[in-house]
């Protein structure tokens, strides 16, 4: 298990290259959910998601000049941006159906993209082959100490921000793909509030962490269905991340694509924020699982905002509760 002190060391390394993203609240969303919610708006981070934190921490400690990473899009942008900040080179293995906004983002940071078929090929195997053949450093999306500690810096910021407003959460809702963000976040938050309930939120049919927590072992998703939450389509939890998460997390929650789209609409309507589907699942859980949030102080992590315009406009057509 890693410590808050290691996360503090990571923060010292990366803080000059990241945004300290704001915390926000909405009386209207509190009314809808009958709870008291604080939002961490990590969609306002550089590259549009939390992923740059881990990438900066990893690359900042490596002596290599070249890096390769498998990614659905946000990790790719984080790695490309971090490599550029350190004047290094990046190659990203991305699905051919990745959102255009994420592809354009990677290219804007100078990343070299290699596309693969999400449903037929293994991006990790492709990236590791490149690493072996060319001597590039392989940067995993979540299952590595430096990635976890880098993502944990988000939790370190939250500790500081909530202290300033005297807010003590009862419950935390955070997206979960491979588990890198929520494991680092949990280490940070549990250093202050050991009895905190932290729930991973995943897309329906891709709830491998939810099932793994129930079964007390890593579950593998075999029936791969499509989902609009492209950033969270992990078929099994990371080995390292799950060792942490099975000790620190409460039960998992899954949300539908429709609920994620409605949450994007709610975020735009009441927070004036733009979220991507995977970045909105924690809000979707708050809106749809009253038994988890009602009459509680809740921290909701809004993890990313890299959404294609067409999907965003479609989200605004969904029906949401108006006040």
Go through the PLM ranges and name each one:
Residues 1-323:
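PLP-dependent amino-acid enzyme catalytic core
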């Amino acid at each position: 298990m890693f410590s808050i002190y290691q996360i503090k060391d990571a923060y010292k390394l990366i803080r000059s290259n990241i945004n300290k993203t704001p915390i926000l609240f909405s009386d209207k969303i509190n009314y809808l959910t009958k709870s008291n919610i604080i939002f961490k708006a990590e969609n306002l981070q550089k590259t549009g998601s939390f992923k740059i934190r881990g990438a900066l921490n990893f690359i900042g400690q490596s002596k290599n000049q070249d890096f390769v990473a498998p990614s659905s899009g946000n990790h790719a942008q984080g790695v490309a941006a971090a490599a550029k900040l350190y004047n290094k080179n990046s190659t990203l293995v991305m699905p051919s159906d990745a959102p255009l906004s994420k592809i354009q983002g990677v290219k804007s940071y100078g990343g070299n993209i290699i596309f693969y078929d999400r449903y037929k090929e293994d991006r990790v195997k492709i990236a590791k082959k490149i690493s072996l053949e060319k001597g590039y450093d392989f940067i995993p999306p979540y299952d590595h100490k430096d990635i976890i500690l880098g993502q944990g810096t988000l939790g370190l910021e939250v500790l500081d921000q909530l202290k300033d407003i005297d807010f003590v959460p009862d419950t935390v809702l955070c997206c979960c793909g491979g588990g890198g963000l929520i494991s680092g976040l949990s280490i940070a938050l549990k250093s202050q509030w050991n009895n905190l309930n932290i729930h991973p939120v995943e897309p329906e049919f891709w709830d491998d962490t939810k099932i793994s927590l129930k079964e007390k072992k890593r579950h593998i998703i075999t029936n791969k269905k499509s989902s609009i939450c492209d950033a969270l389509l992990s078929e099994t939890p990371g080995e390292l991340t799950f060792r942490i998460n099975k000790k620190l997390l409460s039960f998992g929650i899954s949300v539908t694509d429709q609920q994620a789209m409605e949450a994007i609409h709610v975020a735009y309507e009441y927070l004036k924020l733009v979220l991507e589907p995977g970045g909105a699942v924690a809000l979707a859980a708050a809106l749809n699982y009253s038994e988890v949030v009602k009459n509680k102080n809740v921290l909701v992590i809004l993890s990313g905002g890299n959404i294609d315009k067409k999907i965003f406009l479609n989200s605004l057509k969904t029906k949401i509760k108006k006040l």
